[in-house]
Swiss-Prot record:
GO molecular function, one term: peptidyl-tRNA hydrolase activity
Protein name: Peptidyl-tRNA hydrolase
Stored PROSITE patterns: PEPT_TRNA_HYDROL_1
Gene3D superfamilies attached to this UniProt entry: Peptidyl-tRNA hydrolase (3.40.50.1470)
Pfam families found in the cross-reference section: Pept_tRNA_hydro
Assembly description: Monomer.
Gene designation: pth
Amino acid sequence: MKLIIGLGNPESRYNNTRHNIGFDLVDSLAAAFGSSFSSGKGKYLAAKITHRQETLMLIKPTTYMNLSGHAVVAAMNFHKVQKNDILVVCDDLNLPSGTMRLRAKGSAGGQNGLKHIIESLGSDEFARLRIGIRLGEMPPGSFSSFVLGKFSAEERVVMDRTLESCREAVLDFAKNGIEHAMNHYNKSAE
């Protein structure tokens, strides 16, 4: 079993924001497999899908982004999953929109959800899929207002195409592992 943890903020006012791209990905995976989310045994929602004999539990923390580690630990404990069987999906302001980066481990890179997960697990050795949200020219204002802002129509087209590739990358990770997925999917959207 693999846990695919999409990061985001739980309130509906954050739907379709750049910061919630992790939720968007697990939502789209659940929809593609005809699954739906229900309450998990902790502060998260879960949906189960099966792909090529691999079971994936899609997880959406019901905590705010900066407390995501609580949900990750609860889901790992309940499903008896080790760090090498999780993939955390989040936004990345340092990557251009339309880009994804898979990593087997690493720092939080300024992403507060990843930071809390690293603190909660006591380790940075878990796979993550970062989805780029940076525009070529960043608009004036705070980074916070940008990441919590909704995608423009043009951005949404790019992100929808990127999410297709991300779904494929997640399924590749589940079947073949992080190294294989990294070799095949670390590129910009065409």
